Amino acid sequence: MKTQGAHVSTDPRAAIAAADTALGIEFGSTRIKAVLIGPDHEVLATGGHGWENHLEGGLWSYTLDEVVAGLQSAYASLVADVRERYDVTPVSYGSIGISAMMHGYLAFDADDNLLAPFRTWRNTNTGRAADELTRLFGFNIPLRWSIAHLHQAVLDSEEHEPRVARPTAPAGRGPHPA
């Protein structure tokens, strides 16, 4: 808040109790980060969860269960930080923002069932597809883009490919368990 050019700080504990805060969650490739921002745009608390993709069937992946567990862990560590700093537990937020990796491949059917393990940005098996798409569009298509993964699945006649109704990356999915 500003009053006649002077900066007036808001009490963090009161802001948290009044839900005058913003919660941010970011799903990065090696860490899930959580941050609580106050009305003065100051960081009030943070939390996080380290994770690492793993080889599954020759491809780098995370499971959706790992996504949910990582979110829960990052959020729990944020809440613990809030409690330790301010002796209050947040129960509501003024706003929530979620950011996730924009690269990789999640393939869902018409009923929103995951058809193949998530393929992370780290996979480089999409060279042929990326080259073909780059030539077709006259625009560089990186190996890690979802469209390169989808086209590679078509080129490889992967079992799941005919049932893909919605290909996306983590940024297009969000961690909403069924």
Would you name each region that the model predicts?
Residues 77-178:
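Glycine-rich phosphate-binding/catalytic subdomain of phosphoryl-transfer
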Residues 1-116:
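N-terminal glycine/serine-rich phosphate-binding loop of ATP-dependent small-molecule kinases
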